[in-house]
Swiss-Prot record:
Protein name, per record: UPF0301 protein Vapar_4617
InterPro entries, A to Z: AlgH-like
S-S pairs: none
Cellular component GO terms held in the UniProt record: cytosol
Organism per entry: Variovorax paradoxus (strain S110)
Lineage, highest ranks first: Bacteria, Pseudomonadati, Pseudomonadota, Betaproteobacteria, Burkholderiales
Length: 199
């Protein structure tokens, strides 16, 4: 089979860990890829809550959370890189309806597919006051792959890939996200062999 000359781009896709994944960080994980190019990939694990919730996080950064319904939401372990740094995955918030390319926040990556990832504190300040995006996932740390690293892991069948569905991120209970992501491929976890790709 001839190699495809176009570089692989899995931006706005889920990486779903195969059952045999031995790395504890990524075992049974679903990673939302925010960026993927020939230089590497960056994503956030969306189904590994940390031991703190948003109420605790906001207290740590000295912000009063005026939206109590957000307080119990978990802060996620986005990955093993920069685990003290916050990353907020959210639905788009625009300065003007007629200028959707302009984000409200100081440091926001617009992800093709309709989501945004913000790393500046202003998004948390907006959430604290009751403004800001309605649908959010807050994580500490992120997941990163160097040039060719993700492609190599895909070739080893470490991951399944599927186009991302924001409903899995924002509207699905944490403990169901792995299975829901697999269902996007028409698969069920119990049918997958832990030895896939290692015959």
């Amino acid at each position: 089979m001839a190699a495809d000359s176009a570089p692989m781009n899995l931006t706005h896709h889920f990486l779903i860990a195969m059952p045999g994944m031995e790395d504890k960080t990524f075992n049974r994980s679903v990673v939302y890829l925010c960026e993927h190019s020939e230089r590497g990939a960056l994503g956030l694990v969306i189904n590994k809550p940390s031991d703190i919730n948003l109420k605790v996080l906001f207290e740590k950064i000295e912000l009063h959370l005026s939206r109590p319904e957000l307080g119990d939401a978990p802060v996620f372990q986005g990955g093993p890189v920069q685990t003290e740094r916050g990353f907020v995955l959210h639905e788009p918030v625009f300065t003007h309806a007629e200028k959707p390319e302009e984000s409200v926040y100081a440091s926001t990556m617009t992800i093709p597919g309709g989501l945004e990832m913000t790393t500046s504190k202003d998004v948390l300040e907006a959430l604290a006051t009751g403004a800001g995006p309605r649908k959010v996932l807050v994580s500490l740390g992120y997941s990163a792959w160097g040039e060719g690293q993700l492609e190599s892991e895909l070739a080893e069948n470490s991951w399944l890939t599927v186009g991302a569905d924001p409903a899995v991120i924002f509207d699905t209970p944490v403990e169901q996200r792995y299975d829901r992501a697999l269902l996007l491929l028409g698969l069920e976890a119990w049918k997958l062999s832990p030895e896939a790709g290692h015959a």
